[in-house]
Every structure is written in C-alpha cells, then in structure tokens.
C-alpha cells in the first residue's frame, strides 16, 4: 500500500541549487534511502516532504493529503541531523512534553513515555538531563518522541553522522523493526554502507536531479553504478 507519492517536485534558490522534477513513492513498511553527495539536494527534499519548505512545482501527497495538513503532520516524524533537545529537561520529561503536544488530554502519557524509552533501550537514562547525554543517546530520545507521536513515516536526515559502529547497527535494526510493524522510513544519507545494510530501495540524486531509483539488490548487482556512486560520495561511509 502506498504511503507517500512525490510527483515532479522542484524547489530552486537564487543561486540555482535545489531539486528538479523529483518523482518517487514510498510504500507502507518500506525503508527508502535518499543517497547523494553533499549539496545534492537531500536536505531540500526532506524539508519539502515535511512541509518546512513549499515546493515551487510538483505535488507531495501522504495518504492522499499534502504535508501541511494537520493530520499528516501527526503521522510524520522528522529526525534531524542534529538532535535538538531541551538541555535542562530529563529524557523522560522531553518525551512527555512531545506526547502531550500530540495527544493532549491522554491519561496514559507516562505509560507511553516508559514504553518508548524501553523500545529505544534508554529506560536507565529516563531521569538524566538531556544536556548530559551522548549524541547517540540524544538521537534515541528524539526517536522515542516520534514513537509517542504514533508516527507512520519516519524521515531521518543524515542519522549516522557522529555515531559509533554499535549505534549505527542499533539504528539499522530499529528501523527494520519499525517497518515490520507497518511504519515506513525515508533516510537521507551519504553512507552507502548504511544504505546497503538497512534500506529496501535507494534513490540516487546528484545536483538536485534523480539519477536512479532501484531496489538495493538491483543496485548491488550493478557494479558500474556502485563505482560511480562511490566516486561521487568520495568515500565508502561517513565514519
């Protein structure tokens, strides 16, 4: 079942950078990676998908409605490249704040927060200040906030930057678990290694234009494309 449809998405800036005529879709239970070098248009794409930017042209529909629709916003969770947390709040307080924002009046907020912390293996850090957490732990707090939001689509912007190998592996496994539960994920990255380990499909962009949209096994079979992507990225991974 299709969750999101992007048709002829274009967003340009005065300097000419942006994205042009991007078209792709995301199915329920699918992990789609947006792969490209720095400046390819990955962040612009994400900001359009989440409603932060208004496209110059094209359509974005999530379950048949645009990103700005209030019901859509409840179903889409953005995990930014920099985890923005209130340093003076504990991990549990931050998640509780998010839960009350999306589900005002709910009486099971504390229970939701506990289960979310448990799901991201952070229950022991529940009462620790966010300002004292490591980068990987902060990211898990953001993920827990998305869980209590009851998101259907997780949009992650460069999620592996700054993470050690165990944290990257944990994130990969967690995303697969969420999609097994019927959620979907759209991951913007320049880590080819993480894409091959985690994603079902890979969308390659360069200079804001779509180069390829392939299932990962197809991509792995095409040696010439792999070589070209590695050349464009300049490195095998973001470690």
UniProtKB/Swiss-Prot annotation:
Protein name: SkfA peptide export ATP-binding protein SkfE
Keywords on record: Antibiotic biosynthesis, ATP-binding, Bacteriocin biosynthesis, Cell membrane, Membrane, Nucleotide-binding, Translocase, Transport
GO molecular function: ABC-type sulfate transporter activity; ABC-type thiosulfate transporter activity; ATP binding; ATP hydrolysis activity
Induction record: By Spo0A and PhoP, during nutrient starvation, especially phosphate starvation. Repressed by AbrB during normal growth when nutrients are plentiful, in association with the transcriptional repressor Abh.
Binding site for ATP: 36-43
Topology in membrane: Peripheral membrane protein
A Pfam family annotated for this UniProt entry: ABC_tran
Broad EC category: translocase
Disruption phenotype: When the skfA-skfB-skfC-skfE-skfF-skfG-skfH operon is deleted, increased rate of spore formation; a double operon deletion (sdpA-sdpC plus skfA-skfH) makes spores even faster.
InterPro entries registered for this protein in UniProt: AAA+_ATPase, ABC_transporter-like_ATP-bd, ABC_Transporter_VariousFunc, P-loop_NTPase
PROSITE patterns for this protein: ABC_TRANSPORTER_2
Miscellaneous: Accelerated cannibalism by skf- cells is seen on solid media but not in liquid media.
Source lineage: Bacteria, Bacillati, Bacillota, Bacilli, Bacillales
Keyword Lipid biosynthesis attributed: no
Domain ABC transporter: 4-232
Highest taxon, organism lineage: Bacteria
Gene name as annotated: skfE
CDD domains linked to this entry: ABC_DR_subfamily_A
Enzyme Commission no: 7.3.2.3
Catalytic activity annotation: sulfate(out) + ATP + H2O = sulfate(in) + ADP + phosphate + H(+); thiosulfate(out) + ATP + H2O = thiosulfate(in) + ADP + phosphate + H(+)
GO cellular component: a single term: plasma membrane
Function noted in UniProt: Probably part of the ABC transporter SkfEF involved in the export of the bacteriocin SKF. Probably responsible for energy coupling to the transport system.
Protein family per UniProt: Belongs to the ABC transporter superfamily. SkfA peptide export (TC 3.A.1.128.1) family.
Location, primary (coarse class): membrane
Subcellular locations according to the entry: Cell membrane
Claim: Transport is one of the keywords in the record: yes
């Amino acid at each position: 079942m299709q969750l999101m449809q992007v048709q002829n998405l274009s967003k340009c800036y005065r300097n000419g950078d942006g994205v042009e005529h991007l078209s792709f879709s995301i199915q329920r239970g699918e992990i789609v990676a947006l792969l490209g070098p720095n400046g390819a248009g990955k962040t612009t794409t994400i900001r359009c998908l989440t409603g932060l930017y208004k496209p110059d042209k094209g359509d974005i529909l999530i379950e048949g409605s645009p990103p700005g629709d209030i019901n859509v916003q409840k179903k889409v969770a953005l995990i930014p490249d920099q985890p923005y947390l209130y340093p003076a709040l504990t991990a549990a307080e931050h998640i509780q704040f998010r839960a009350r924002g999306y589900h005002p009046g709910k009486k099971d907020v504390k229970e939701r927060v506990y289960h979310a912390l448990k799901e991201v293996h952070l229950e022991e850090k529940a009462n620790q200040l966010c300002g004292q957490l490591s980068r990987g732990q902060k990211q898990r707090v953001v993920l827990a906030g998305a869980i209590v939001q009851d998101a259907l689509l997780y949009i992650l912007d460069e999620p592996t930057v700054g993470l050690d190998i165990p944290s990257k592996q944990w994130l990969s496994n967690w995303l697969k678990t969420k999609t097994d539960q019927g959620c979907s994920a759209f991951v913007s990255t320049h880590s080819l290694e993480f894409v091959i380990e985690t994603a079902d499909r890979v969308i390659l962009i360069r200079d804001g234009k779509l180069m390829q949209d392939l299932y990962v096994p197809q991509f792995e079979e095409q040696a010439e494309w792999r070589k070209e992507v590695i050349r464009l990225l300049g490195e095998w991974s973001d470690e």
